[in-house]
């Protein structure tokens, strides 16, 4: 995923109230950010390049985060508290863009600057203190959003629905979802994510950030039923991949009462009728349920 695509995801989920991805070596997966008490962030860098500007960009940002937390706690567990969080998150994402700009500039000028272990560790620590994860995809570095940070910062301040949303996303973020349009989790785990977000929607029908939860459900369901460019549901010969078929059958047996499983069951019926090959009937069924193809689409990485 290139930087433009990555920024689009975060912008999409901000404007419609959803999530961000942006874009150092390929297939590198970030560990969870350390707990705040364990962080000893550097006051400055001396790389002689754009990275040296990042500490000054973040100066005072933790105070802004603390103020937002206090403001949310003053109206704890209400929609107003969620609004405080979402408003601060918009500022957070704009800061992330500025940091990502510096990372992009630094690696274009000093190609190996982030290969220095000490610099990379210091930068990871500095970003983690303010809720950013130093993440990589397809050779590009970016400042990603750490949802686990939000759960700590706004612990006890948000509505149950928002707290649940952030916990779910923090858990999902700990496992890379895709890289280079190839699925990084199993088909069964992908199905489980779709079911989880369906259950979330049922449990919290009045969730104030529905566009975000809907985005994740649609992304997982669409990927499950249409695949990705480098993780296809149909083989080169045109038949359903055996592991995908096994996952579909497992989902239908495990969660028969869910809308997700019921749709998959209908797909299986149509597939069986056509020798487990794609058909116009399946395309029509998916269209009726607003399932769009993920082929030719850059999926989120985390």
Residue spans for each PLM region:
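A cross-kingdom marker for long, charged
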Residues: 222-223, 234-302
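Short solvent-exposed coil/turn linkers within tandem alpha-helical repeat scaffolds
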Residues: 152-160, 200-212, 251-262
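Amphipathic alpha-helices of TPR/Sel1-like and other helical repeat/solenoid scaffolds
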Residues: 190-203, 244-251
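Short coil/turn linking the two alpha-helices of tandem helical-hairpin repeats
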Residues: 97-100, 111-114, 121, 131-134, ...
């Amino acid at each position: 995923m290139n930087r433009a695509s990555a920024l689009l995801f975060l912008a999409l989920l901000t404007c419609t109230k959803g999530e961000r991805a942006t874009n150092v070596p390929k297939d590198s997966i970030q560990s969870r950010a350390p707990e705040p008490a364990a962080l000893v962030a550097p006051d400055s860098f001396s790389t002689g390049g754009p990275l040296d500007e990042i500490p000054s960009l973040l100066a005072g940002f933790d105070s802004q985060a603390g103020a937002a937390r206090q403001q949310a706690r003053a109206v704890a567990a209400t929609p107003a508290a969620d609004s405080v969080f979402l408003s601060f998150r918009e500022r957070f994402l704009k800061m992330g863009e500025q940091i990502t700009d510096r990372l992009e500039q630094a690696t274009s000028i000093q190609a190996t600057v982030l290969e220095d272990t000490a610099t990379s560790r210091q930068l990871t620590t500095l970003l983690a203190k303010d809720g950013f994860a130093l993440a990589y995809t397809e050779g590009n570095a970016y400042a990603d959003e750490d949802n686990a940070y939000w759960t700590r910062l706004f612990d006890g301040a948000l509505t149950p629905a928002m707290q649940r949303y952030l916990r779910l996303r923090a858990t999902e973020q700990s496992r890379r979802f895709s890289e280079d349009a190839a699925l990084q989790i199993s088909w069964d785990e992908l199905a489980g994510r779709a079911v989880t977000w369906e259950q979330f929607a049922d449990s919290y029908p009045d969730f104030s950030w529905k566009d975000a939860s809907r985005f994740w459900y649609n992304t997982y369901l669409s990927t499950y039923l249409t695949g990705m460019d480098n993780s296809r549901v149909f083989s080169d010969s045109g038949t359903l991949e055996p592991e995908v078929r096994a996952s579909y059958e497992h989902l239908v047996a495990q969660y028969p009462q869910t809308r997700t499983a019921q749709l998959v069951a209908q797909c299986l019926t149509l597939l069986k009728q056509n020798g487990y090959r794609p058909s116009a009937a399946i395309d029509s069924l998916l269209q009726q349920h607003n399932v769009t193809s993920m082929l030719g689409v850059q999926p989120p990485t985390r």
